[in-house]
């Protein structure tokens, strides 16, 4: 069972964007950072374990040549082997900051030359893979940035061309030294998934076709791809082959966020039906097939959810954001 803990107030509310919550745990400092997007700004908050807000500040998208301020599409902390960077994407470009958000170390402007006059230009979908940070774009390309151990000498090292539709989300997991391992998956507005092997050069391993609905959120855990779709379903695929093992009718409306507690294999799903569910993923020791068990369901009444994240790697607490909701709601197990 989970209970509603003390909420963390926001200055505004959360924009109606999928995956609109990022969480960074800082156990050494007994702090948790939260990041939420609202229009042209991103709100960064730090809170003590009891949910007591300690600090709050705003980041704004870098101005371009346009008349109106650019809208932010996502904010996400990327945990690299040697540093943590905060990445902010917008309709203008990609901004990278030190983890506290005070120092910008890199700016990449989006090239709108290939876009048609009626096509929106934006970046969306952020994940760290080794010493790389991968960011999706409106064109379907994934930009791969090589991150140094310190300093601002960040380099765009590669562009991955597996998609024809805008990227929605990217998920990664450590490769753990295995050969030919599938350690990154990208999703797009058509529901297509591309599975990659990271490295000095990223390699496309397989494509998992869509079926007419977008895939707003995707996660990867021990070779299992969890994909949340616009029809409320969660699909579990074998990453190396792309084979579908499990199909869950998880929500009555579109899924807006997935997250994984990596230590225990718990999957968090949030949908526009106001529900949050927790699932336990595992493999049958004899057949190797993927299995799933429903652990918990929570209704956040009268709220269009748009973000959900575990607050710890063991899945004992989670937080959610909602459109027009001026707080981050926290839940913990009892």
From Swiss-Prot:
InterPro entries: WD40/YVTN_repeat-like_dom_sf (IPR015943), WD40_repeat_dom_sf (IPR036322), WD40_rpt (IPR001680), WDR54_beta_propeller (IPR049546). GO terms for biological process: fusion of sperm to egg plasma membrane involved in single fertilization; negative regulation of receptor internalization; regulation of epidermal growth factor receptor signaling pathway; regulation of MAPK cascade; single fertilization. Expressed in epithelial cells (at protein level). Isoform 3 expression is highly increased in colorectal cancer cells. Keywords: Cell membrane, Cytoplasm, Fertilization, Membrane, Repeat, Ubl conjugation, WD repeat. One of its GO terms (cellular component) is vesicle. Pfam families: WDR54. Homodimer and homotrimer; forms tight forms of dimers and trimers. Interacts with IZUMO1 and IZUMO1R/JUNO. WD6 repeat is required for cross-linking by TGM2. Plays a role in the adhesion and fusion of the sperm-oocyte membrane through its interactions with IZUMO1 and IZUMO1R/JUNO. When cross-linked to form dimers and trimers, it has a regulatory effect on ERK signaling pathway activity in response to EGF stimulation. Colocalizes with the EGF receptor in WDR54-specific vesicle where it sustains the internalization and controls the degradation of the EGF receptor after EGF stimulation. This is WD repeat-containing protein 54. The lineage of its organism: Eukaryota, Metazoa, Chordata, Craniata, Vertebrata.
């Amino acid at each position: 069972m989970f209970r509603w803990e003390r909420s963390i107030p926001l200055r505004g509310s959360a924009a109606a964007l999928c995956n609109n919550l990022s969480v960074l745990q800082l156990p050494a400092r007994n702090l948790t950072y939260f990041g939420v997007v609202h229009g042209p700004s991103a709100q960064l908050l730090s809170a003590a374990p009891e949910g007591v807000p300690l600090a709050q500040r705003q980041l704004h998208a870098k101005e371009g040549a346009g008349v109106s301020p650019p809208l932010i599409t996502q904010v996400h902390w990327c945990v690299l082997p040697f540093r943590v960077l905060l990445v902010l994407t917008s309709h203008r470009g990609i901004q990278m900051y030190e983890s506290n958000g005070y120092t910008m170390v890199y700016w990449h402007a989006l090239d709108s030359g290939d876009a048609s006059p009626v096509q929106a230009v934006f970046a969306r979908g952020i994940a760290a893979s080794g010493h790389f940070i991968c960011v999706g774009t409106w064109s379907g390309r994934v930009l791969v940035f090589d991150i140094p151990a310190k300093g601002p000498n960040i380099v765009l090292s590669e562009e991955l061309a597996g998609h024809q539709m805008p990227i929605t989300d990217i998920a990664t997991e450590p490769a753990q030294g295995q050969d030919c391992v599938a350690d990154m998956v990208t999703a797009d507005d058509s529901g297509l998934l591309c599975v990659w092997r990271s490295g000095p050069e990223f390699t496309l391993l397989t494509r998992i076709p869509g079926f007419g609905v977008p895939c707003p959120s995707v996660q990867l855990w021990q070779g299992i791809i969890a994909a949340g779709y616009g029809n409320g379903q969660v699909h579990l695929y074998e990453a190396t082959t792309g084979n579908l093992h499990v199909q869950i009718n998880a929500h009555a409306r579109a899924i807006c966020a997935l997250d994984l507690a990596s230590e225990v294999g718990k999957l968090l799903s949030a949908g526009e039906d106001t529900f949050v569910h927790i699932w336990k993923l595992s493999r049958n020791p004899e057949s190797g097939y993927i299995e799933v068990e429903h652990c918990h369901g929570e209704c956040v009444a009268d709220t269009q959810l748009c973000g959900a994240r575990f607050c710890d790697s063991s899945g004992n607490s989670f937080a959610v954001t909602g459109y027009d909701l001026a707080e981050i709601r926290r839940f913990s197990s009892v």
